[in-house]
């Protein structure tokens, strides 16, 4: 299977990446590769099933890290509420400023992301556990545990973090794959 851009990981960040890539590159052929049987499974468990999207109190003045550009990024990033409103999902804040979907159901967030990606023609390959990525003359060769072989000019890795491995993400996966790509494409 060939694609222009492969996005490894079909969670919230993988689906959002697909939507944003389509916005920036409307003609690009996109493929989301998800190791589980469906995209967005972990979204359903976030925020105790309500999916806490953001917080009204996010501000550069609350950032205390060492990255000096963070304030600029925070101040000029669209809010989660605006992003999801653009996807057709209404949000509401609770008394502590936490932003949830108006429905108070994480399934609404998954539906908004998945439907927008589908509306935009993003292809999704589920049940495909990526075992290797190799750099090639034309981009990348991606091998899956099920025998599927995918070639892509570009790859976005959005495989999730370490939290809640019972939902199919263990975090170690992304580091192993990135380490393999880096070691194969860069000389020490």
Model-derived segments and spans:
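Residue-level signal for inorganic ion chemistry
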Residues: 84, 113, 177
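Hydrophobic anchor at the start of a short beta-strand
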Residues: 28-31, 91, 155, 181
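Beta1/beta-strand and adjacent pyrophosphate-binding region of the FAD-binding site
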Residues: 1-13, 31
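Short beta-strand to alpha-helix junction loop
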Residues: 68-78, 95-115, 125, 162-169
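Glycine-rich active-site loop/strand segments that organize a redox cofactor
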Residues: 47-96
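Short, well-ordered alpha-helices that flank and scaffold nucleotide-derived cofactor binding pockets
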Residues: 19, 23, 115
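Predominantly flavin-linked oxidoreductase catalytic cores and closely associated redox partners
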Residues: 107-108, 116-188
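Glycine-rich FAD pyrophosphate-binding loop
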Residues: 6, 22-48
């Amino acid at each position: 299977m060939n694609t222009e851009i492969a996005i490894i990981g079909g969670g919230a960040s993988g689906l959002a990446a697909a939507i944003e890539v389509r916005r920036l590159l409307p003609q690009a052929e996109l493929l989301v590769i998800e190791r589980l049987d469906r995209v967005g499974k972990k979204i359903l468990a976030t925020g105790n099933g309500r999916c806490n999207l953001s917080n009204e109190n996010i501000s550069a003045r609350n950032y205390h890290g060492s990255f000096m550009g963070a304030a600029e990024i925070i101040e000029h990033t669209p809010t989660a509420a605006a992003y999801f409103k653009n996807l057709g999902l209404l949000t509401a804040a609770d008394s502590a400023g936490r932003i949830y979907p108006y429905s108070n159901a994480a399934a609404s967030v998954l539906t908004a992301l998945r439907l927008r990606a589908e509306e935009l023609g993003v292809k999704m390959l589920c049940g495909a556990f990526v075992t290797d990525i190799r750099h090639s003359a034309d981009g990348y060769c991606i091998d899956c545990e099920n025998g599927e072989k995918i070639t892509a000019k570009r790859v976005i890795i959005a495989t999730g973090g370490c939290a809640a491995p019972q939902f199919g993400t263990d975090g170690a996966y992304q580091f192993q794959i990135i380490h393999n790509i880096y070691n194969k494409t860069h000389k020490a």
